[in-house]
Amino acid sequence: MDAVLACRLRGRGNRVAALRPRPRPGGSAGPSPFALLCAGLSPEPRAGVGSEFPAWFLGGSSQRRNMALLGSRAELEADEDVFEDALETISISSHSDMATSSLHFASCDTQQAPRQRGASTVSSSSSTKVDLKSGLEECAVALNLFLSNKFTDALELLRPWAKESMYHALGYSTIVVLQAVLTFEQQDIQNGISAMKDALQTCQKYRKKYTVVESFSSLLSRGSLEQLSEEEMHAEICYAECLLQKAALTFVQDENMINFIKGGLKIRTSYQIYKECLSILHEIQKNKLQQEFFYEFEGGVKLGSGAFNLMLSLLPARIIRLLEFIGFSGNRELGLLQLREGASGRSMRSALCCLTILAFHTYISLILGTGEVNVAEAERLLAPFLQQFPNGSLVLFYHARIELLKGNLEEAQEVFQKCISVQEEWKQFHHLCYWELMWINVFQQNWMQAYYYSDLLCKESKWSKATYVFLKAAILSMLPEEDVVATNENVVTLFRQVDSLKQRIAGKSIPTEKFAVRKARRYSASLPAPVKLILPALEMMYVWNGFSIVSKRKDLSENLLVTVEKAEAALQSQNFNSFSVDDECLVKLLKGCCLKNLQRPLQAELCYNHVVESEKLLKYDHYLVPFTLFELASLYKSQGEIDKAIKFLETARNNYKDYSLESRLHFRIQAALHLWRKPSSD
């Protein structure tokens, strides 16, 4: 399969496409219209059957095989055959980053953005095509519109040529897909998939077509990489980006196994395309070949290859070993380097590279990592965006996240509120802010205000109803009974709703929803009476690594410790029941986190050891022991005992399985091992 794909990209004819990409006014090509798109969602085209793999490899009929080898577009309607569709068009979207110093924005006036569609240069041939230069120009304008909160204007600018220009197709479908991901509405998801199919077909028109002889000779020789025309090079990058996004939507569209296979194959094909494009990039640089829009192709390769390297490197060791067996590999340092190089360039994808790095620093490192965040780089990368788009929702959102990670909760609150107020067009951005504001109020123990935002999420967002309802009930559980009555909510009823609200993605339950369902069982109608959860809001705060944020604030850590110690005292006065040991261990874990944040390591260690020593007595919350071992490792690392810390990490990773949130802990262990091991140990 890999050899055949290599043929597609390497054995190109001797065409030197003269489509000159044009530098932006003022000499700088603006950030990709889709850098902005949610910290790293890339464009998303998709195409037909024969062009991705020779038909004889797919096992089609003789007529179909000949059409495929000749690059006929009759193959584009292959969707009826789900397995061939899975083999042919393979994609998943990668998260983007923000990058470095010399970031250039398109100098187009966004006020005039929805300009005349006739501005695009169209070839005079019967088959209408928009040239590369015009496609890049209009995408840069659309990017500025998007970052300026003019989402509909950006769509309308790109829509007229979305079936003729690869970059219009990529930009248009990316915005539609982003909207689908944010709303989680089935109709929006279907619209995203439809837009993605059209985009892939549009990109397919620009990809290299093979004759039978070329297909056969390419199998025997790598050919000359530089023989790929500039337009065809861009078509490969756009096609790969579209495949990634289509794969992402495939996972959320339905939970059946066929969609899971299709999505996985799309990812693999996209990955292989990026590998081949990286080889082409190196060949061009080595031979110093002249291409007018080389910087745009380079930006696309850096974004795709860098994001793949970064994301694959985050995976737990056991998954990495499996993926390496089927041809994947990831290197975190290389991925960050490629993204930083892409971000420092002048391509449209520079902004996407920046946003990918920002997503890594402000979200991924916290939720799936140790909480050790490179805030300085995040601030440096965001600075040019803040200057250019001071009221852009996406820019403000990242600004608020950075303030939050610095412990400036009050400043973060103000910026999140501003992010909500600057636009009404995409309410989904509001939901992201509601989530953050809910947690800020949890950190501050402003329970009524936290309830307000959790209630908004329950009513307006469809991302994870089970999680939202559980959190609302958990927050209400922290309030005095009279305050709960004033809300007209019934905590027991809310907890009992959780199980019916859980969903599946790619055929799998969402780990945090499974966790919420298990915890809510204590309120099941089948029990003689509900057994009240202990500190459920703080437990969820721990699950989302909120104690890492609170560690920057001594006052908040002290207040949380008071709350935990009150719960500890209340437990000691209660009658013993089947949940008592589990509740006691949870309280000890939370107390240990507070003590560690307050620089009281010996007391924290005593709390953690109590949990580990109670392992055999736990009946329900078996996740507490491996997570506590991780906290002990973190404690020892902070005291300079690296070898001891690594030993505890390996114990947590190797000696425990089948507990709640296991994959999340394995992600954190992988991140910690990567950061803490000496270079020689790697």
From Swiss-Prot:
A single GO BP: regulation of cholesterol efflux
Pfam families from the UniProt entry: Iml2-TPR_39, TPR_8
InterPro entries: Iml2/TPR_39, TPR-like_helical_dom_sf, TPR_rpt
UniProtKB keywords: Lipid metabolism, Repeat, TPR repeat, Ubl conjugation pathway
TPR repeat windows: 393-426, 626-659
PANTHER family attached to this UniProt entry: TETRATRICOPEPTIDE REPEAT PROTEIN 39 FAMILY MEMBER, TETRATRICOPEPTIDE REPEAT PROTEIN 39B
Membership in a protein family: Belongs to the TTC39 family.
Function: Regulates high density lipoprotein (HDL) cholesterol metabolism by promoting the ubiquitination and degradation of the oxysterols receptors LXR (NR1H2 and NR1H3).
Protein's UniProt name: Tetratricopeptide repeat protein 39B
The species this protein was found in: Homo sapiens
The encoding gene: TTC39B
